[in-house]
Regions:
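Active-site-proximal or metal-binding-adjacent scaffold patches in catalytic folds
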Residues: 1-67, 76-116
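Walker B catalytic acidic pair
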Residues: 72
Length: 116
């Protein structure tokens, strides 16, 4: 995915978002914004239903994008910024704990490179 244009990434992100919105039953219109952040992988504004993804992480692969979008979409679905039992239960239905650990490690490594 490293050679993709930003527009190509947006298409992939839209497909992932639409698929997870359907599977999670999120009826609200959810926007995604891609920007550079030094310390954040992704975050969401629950009130505006907007997910922000770090542009520096786009080339880590589609599985990472799926994780980031799913993670933030669960926050929007549950209307909470916290990682409670419901949050983890939903997340684990889609991505195994081992895969989550692997993805998070890759994200941390990339963010550390950005900071230095």
């Amino acid at each position: 995915m490293r050679d993709r244009s930003l527009e190509s990434f947006r298409e992939v992100i839209k497909k992932i978002l639409d698929a997870y919105r359907l599977q999670l039953g999120v009826d609200e219109d959810v926007k995604i914004k891609i920007r550079r952040y030094r310390t954040r992988a992704a975050f969401s504004n629950i009130k505006t239903k907007t997910i922000y993804i770090n542009k520096e992480l786009l080339d880590l692969g589609e599985e990472t994008l799926k994780y980031l979008i799913l993670h933030e979409l669960i926050h929007i679905k549950l209307n909470t910024k916290y990682h409670n039992g419901d949050f983890h239960s939903i997340l684990s239905r889609f991505i195994s704990p081992e895969e989550i650990t692997f993805i998070r490690r890759n994200i941390r490594e990339r963010l550390l490179k950005i900071k230095s």
